[in-house]
């Protein structure tokens, strides 16, 4: 089954690579329109998925990732339209020039070909990835989690209907509709057909893909994100940033999971933090110093060492008091996932040092980690947030779904 999907996807990719920007945008507009027109069927499938997931005992954080609402689905359709407005990188000349030999050389952006994406309980990924792949002339094979099986199938049917209406092969966007996990291992060996693989899920999935895949893999999306409250931080805006980074949508990978507090500000800062977190319903996991300083009003539990590596994805926040900037940077290096980290400070020398020494895909000064998102970065919907350094880093927009080829123009030109 998968080999036939690969053959069809590869054939579709050759056709997609030849489309103009206008033709690709018309397809995306049609997909957005169909998502809204077929909203009832998608939401109905999603309700079944959510009910099944709840019966299976999934956490509230996972249920939030899984659930669609009319507003969320409308936002997904709007994201597709936003991709239409983005500049098409395919065909762009990156650089080049006339060589001494007389050969005119240019390096031009081209599609990757076929992209494979393995993801878990995030139904929005189906549309986000499909729209970005189509905009860049790539075909895509999707393998969603069993928790979103019905939602993904309904969504892909809508996308394929739009493709067919625009005269394009339905195989441009395909989903593996069998939830059998053994098919993941088979997909990982489809290097004959898939040019790049992107896993979006937990650490176990990423480890499996890195160890078993014969396809180039881009990993990321696991966010043990930190905020360091420096000794010079302005407390009022710092609290506002922390509340946003923790509570706006706790189930996302750019949510802060560990708060590092400079010891010189701890006694002043921790009590007001506790009050604010109590109002926001956040449970604090405090180290020894925090446990000594705080006695409410926020719910407070002792921090377990293993929790420093946790991606809670819930209203839980580690709070650790550090001696200085060295302690904060050292902690992030040991426990961070190179996703998103921030410093809250009024000392621009410390800000510059933090930015230079924290090796993460996104580093912020006096801002929330929640900005690490393709839409927020002006990239449109994202295919993933890469925490590695090759071939993409941070939110992966359109350019991350392209490669390049060298093209030489001559006039009977030969090498001397």
From Swiss-Prot:
The keyword Amino-acid biosynthesis applies. Pathway: Amino-acid biosynthesis; L-proline biosynthesis; L-glutamate 5-semialdehyde from L-glutamate: step 2/2. Its EC number is 1.2.1.41. It comes from the Bacteria. Coiled coil: none annotated. It is an enzyme of class 1 (oxidoreductase). It catalyses: L-glutamate 5-semialdehyde + phosphate + NADP(+) = L-glutamyl 5-phosphate + NADPH + H(+). Gene3D superfamilies: Aldehyde Dehydrogenase, Chain A, domain 1, Aldehyde Dehydrogenase, Chain A, domain 2. Keywords: Amino-acid biosynthesis, Cytoplasm, NADP, Oxidoreductase, Proline biosynthesis. PROSITE patterns: PROA (PS01223). InterPro entries: Ald_DH/histidinol_DH, Ald_DH_C, Ald_DH_N, Aldehyde_DH_dom, G-glutamylP_reductase_CS, Glu-5-SA_DH, GPR_dom. It is found in: Cytoplasm. GO terms for biological process: L-proline biosynthetic process. Pfam families: Aldedh. GO terms for molecular function: glutamate-5-semialdehyde dehydrogenase activity; NADP binding. One of its GO terms (cellular component) is cytoplasm. Catalyzes the NADPH-dependent reduction of L-glutamate 5-phosphate into L-glutamate 5-semialdehyde and phosphate. The product spontaneously undergoes cyclization to form 1-pyrroline-5-carboxylate. Belongs to the gamma-glutamyl phosphate reductase family. This is Gamma-glutamyl phosphate reductase. It comes from Salmonella paratyphi A (strain AKU_12601). The lineage of its organism: Bacteria, Pseudomonadati, Pseudomonadota, Gammaproteobacteria, Enterobacterales. The gene is proA.
